[in-house]
């Protein structure tokens, strides 16, 4: 039976009952209480579509796909007939349903997508009640101060071996639920560990020399500071702006330049670049160029205004929401699953085909997939303990006053989980997707539900295999994929992350960038203008008076692979041309040079797509005696030029602070506190506290519990086709079984 949210059901019915009426249609021997269909189902979270040709409603909610005609006594739910107690009734041109319609249809038992969790997984996200409890316990501590804000409240993970024992054998984890709490007391970062079961603070640790994340209320603070500044208002007049209320501010981290930017290292600062709202819905198209305000968040004031030559604000309207366009007419494309989903969701566990994995949301890195296993002919085999975005950076290459500091650590500085963008069915994800709400804590410590935070859907992905033998019947089968999709909007850019599970054991990781380019105002209208060459030194002229500045989107994924067990080894296979010594007319042969990469510093390397890198379990073999392995492919194609490394000189501070950018493969020994490639507190960090630090001690990787980190991404050279809104541009990575199985895994089980 489908388990649906009682809170949502109650809300939908409460709203609907306020405008209900009695119908002569009878249910259970009495008059039915009728409520408006559109309002009731939309408040419940379902999509309502009307097919004028078929004279039929289509209702979509998570795992249920319902078709029903007005007046009919039956509905079709996932391809199966369901008798209705009360038909849909049309009155005054509107559809009405009984107040039992939601329960009758969406809890009919025909949709088996959601199952009851009988044994809570030890990695389940903190519930709203647990978040509130953690905050109450922390606030009761003697050292807590009233104006303290919360950066992150998340599950403190139990011991890894105990979690695997639970996932593989069902052994309960003998540890109380606990929370990690990160706070900001003014500019001071504090970490606390809270025992939720025994309601006490286990540790309280001030963190020295750390700048915390930028929190959502910092955005409002900056806007208020700018609006209240008479000094800034005077500077705006140089740019032809007399009304400061039309100015939109974007608070940005200031980076680190060893004092060469004239900023105090211990101050909590943001740099503010601004845009003019001209009423077209796209203020990004109207940059106020060469104007930067430096705001001190503690003093609540502008401490410095940095200026360059005055550039007129580009004023041409550039809406991207379709207000000035005629929408193309396209016929509907319906994706239906008439017999229901091929996957089930039990609590936070997903089961599809032979895959099982746990899914939870983190306010910094978004979805975390855990205890990933593959059922190989009845044996549950370990593949990955945890996989998630580790971190990312978007560095720009322009040295001008409004650009030189721009290197956005989107997850580490802003929290990409917090900035999750609700997914729109039929646009951001296909109509057959299940959309999951997620709960995190806001900066006040209040539990906040993000609606439609994650989409899960199955899709057709071409042929899995095919062979047409001459004169024989065709042999082929379709490829299916299960996709876990999450979208985060960080300022002008929207990032789409897909975890793609293949039936054949492959896991794809796709990162897509869309949204609005960060653009620079310039003098040139066309490339024939006198200033065009200088104006486009660091970018492309993509509109009159607008340059798209060259930058990079660099993603790093933390992948704690446990290939058939926790102890693994990094193996290299390099195809080589070698002389033919076996005789015959050939002078050369293709051979594989295979060797072990046995330490962390040796493992940190550029990715050569002509070579093979494996994480192998040298203690396990397939039936041919080959060690079971997974291939690591940091870059498996994309639609922009690949980022082969950081486009910065080695003497740049950003290069020293964030070395994860420049190598596509890193492998480190497992340590539970090593989670972020940019380090735990990267904002204004003065040296590398991430992967460069993790690999510094050069620990052995040979037959140990190793963690793989892959860096991938693109160098973004702007083009006109990406303006005023950018089509999604993808970078793809893969984890692929390599002698992990004994044969083609999608052939199916052998007949008895």
From Swiss-Prot:
Its main location: periplasm. Binds 1 copper ion per subunit. Ca(2+) 2 binds at residues 600, 694, 697, 699. GO terms for molecular function: copper ion binding; primary methylamine oxidase activity; quinone binding. The keyword Transport does not apply. Its EC number is 1.4.3.21. Substrate binds at residues 408-419, 490-495. InterPro entries: Cu_Am_Ox_Cu-bd (IPR049947), Cu_Am_ox_TPQ-bd (IPR049948), Cu_amine_oxidase (IPR000269), Cu_amine_oxidase-like_N (IPR012854), Cu_amine_oxidase_C (IPR015798), Cu_amine_oxidase_C_sf (IPR036460), Cu_amine_oxidase_N-reg (IPR016182), Cu_amine_oxidase_N2 (IPR015800). Cu cation binds at residues 551, 553, 716. Pfam families: Cu_amine_oxid (PF01179), Cu_amine_oxidN1 (PF07833), Cu_amine_oxidN2 (PF02727), Cu_amine_oxidN3 (PF02728). Ca(2+) 1 binds at residues 560-562, 705. Its cofactor is Cu cation; Ca(2+); L-topaquinone; Mn(2+). It catalyses: a primary methyl amine + O2 + H2O = an aldehyde + H2O2 + NH4(+). GO terms for cellular component: periplasmic space. Belongs to the copper/topaquinone oxidase family. Homodimer. This is Primary amine oxidase. It comes from Klebsiella michiganensis (strain ATCC 8724 / DSM 4798 / JCM 20051 / NBRC 3318 / NRRL B-199 / KCTC 1686 / BUCSAV 143 / CCM 1901). The lineage of its organism: Bacteria, Pseudomonadati, Pseudomonadota, Gammaproteobacteria, Enterobacterales. The gene is maoA.
């Amino acid at each position: 039976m489908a388990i649906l949210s009682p809170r949502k059901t109650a809300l939908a019915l409460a709203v609907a009952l306020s405008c209900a009426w009695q119908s002569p249609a009878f249910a259970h021997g009495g008059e039915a209480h009728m409520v408006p269909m559109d309002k009731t189902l939309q408040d419940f979270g379902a999509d309502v579509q009307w097919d004028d040709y078929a004279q039929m409603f289509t209702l979509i909610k998570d795992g249920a796909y319902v078709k029903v005609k007005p007046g009919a006594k039956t509905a079709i739910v996932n391809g199966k007939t369901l008798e209705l107690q009360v038909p849909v009734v049309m009155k005054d041109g509107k559809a009405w349903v009984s107040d039992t319609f939601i329960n009758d249809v969406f809890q009919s038992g025909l949709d088996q997508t959601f199952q009851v969790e009988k044994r809570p997984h030890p990695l389940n996200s903190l519930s709203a009640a647990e978040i509130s409890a953690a905050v109450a316990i922390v606030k009761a501590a003697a050292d807590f101060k009233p104006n303290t804000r919360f950066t992150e409240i998340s599950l403190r993970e139990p011991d890894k071996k105990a979690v695997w024992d639970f996932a593989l054998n069902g052994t309960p984890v003998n540890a109380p639920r606990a929370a990690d709490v990160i706070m900001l007391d003014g500019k001071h970062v504090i970490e606390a560990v809270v025992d939720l079961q025994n309601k006490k603070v286990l540790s309280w640790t001030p963190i020295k020399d750390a700048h915390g994340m930028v929190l959502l209320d910092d955005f409002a603070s900056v806007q208020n500071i700018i609006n209240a500044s008479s000094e800034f208002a005077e500077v705006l007049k140089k740019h032809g702006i007399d009304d400061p209320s039309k100015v939109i501010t974007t608070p940005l981290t200031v980076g680190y330049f060893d004092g060469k930017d004239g900023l105090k290292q211990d101050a909590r600062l943001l740099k503010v670049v601004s845009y003019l709202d001209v009423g077209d819905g796209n203020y990004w198209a109207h940059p106020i160029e060469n104007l930067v305000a430096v705001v001190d968040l503690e003093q609540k004031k502008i401490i410095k205004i940095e200026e360059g030559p005055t550039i007129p604000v580009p004023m041409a309207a550039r809406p991207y929401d379709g207000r000035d366009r005629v929408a193309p007419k396209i016929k509907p494309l319906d994706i239906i699953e008439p017999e229901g989903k091929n996957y089930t969701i039990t609590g936070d566990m997903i089961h599809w085909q032979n895959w099982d994995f746990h899914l939870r949301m983190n306010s910094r890195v978004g979805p975390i997939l855990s205890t990933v296993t593959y059922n190989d002919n009845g044996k549950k085999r370990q593949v990955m303990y945890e996989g998630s975005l580790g971190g990312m950076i978007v560095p720009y290459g322009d040295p001008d006053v409004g650009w030189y500091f721009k290197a956005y650590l989107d997850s580490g500085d802003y929290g990409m989980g917090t900035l999750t963008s609700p997914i729109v069915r039929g646009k951001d994800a296909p109509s057959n997707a299940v959309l999951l709400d997620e709960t995190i804590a806001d900066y006040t410590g209040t539990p906040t539900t993000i609606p439609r935070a994650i989409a899960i859907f199955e899709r057709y992905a071409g042929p899995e295999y095919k062979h047409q033998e001459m004169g024989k019947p065709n042999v082929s089968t379709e490829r299916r994929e299960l996709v876990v999709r999450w979208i985060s909007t960080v300022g002008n850019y929207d990032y789409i992350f897909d975890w793609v599970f293949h039936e054949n054991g492959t896991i794809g990781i796709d990162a897509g960038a869309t949204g609005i380019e960060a653009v620079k105002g310039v003098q040139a209208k066309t490339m024939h203008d006198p200033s065009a060459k200088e104006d486009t030194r660091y970018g492309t002229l993509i509109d009159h008076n607008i340059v798209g500045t060259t930058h990079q989107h660099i993603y790093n994924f933390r992948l704690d692979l446990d290939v058939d067990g926790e102890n693994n080894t990094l193996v290299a296979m390099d195809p080589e041309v070698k002389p033919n010594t076996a005789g015959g007319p050939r002078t050369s042969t293709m051979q594989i040079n295979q060797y072990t990469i046995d330490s962390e510093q040796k493992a940190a390397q550029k990715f050569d797509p002509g070579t093979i890198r494996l994480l192998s379990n040298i203690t396990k073999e397939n039936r041919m005696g080959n060690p079971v392995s997974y291939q690591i492919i940091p870059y498996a194609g994309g639609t922009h030029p690949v980022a082969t490394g950081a486009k910065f000189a080695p003497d740049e501070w950003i290069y020293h602070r964030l070395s994860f950018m420049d190598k596509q493969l890193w492998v480190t020994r497992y340590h539970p506190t090593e989670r972020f490639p940019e380090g735990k507190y990267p904002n204004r960090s003065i040296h590398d506290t991430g992967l460069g630090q993790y690999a510094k001690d050069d620990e052995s990787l040979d037959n140990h519990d190793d963690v793989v980190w892959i860096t991938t991404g693109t160098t973004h050279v702007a083009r006109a086709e990406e303006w005023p809104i950018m089509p999604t541009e993808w970078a793809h990575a893969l984890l692929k079984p390599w002698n992990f199985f004994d044969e083609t895994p999608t052939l199916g089980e052998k007949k008895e």
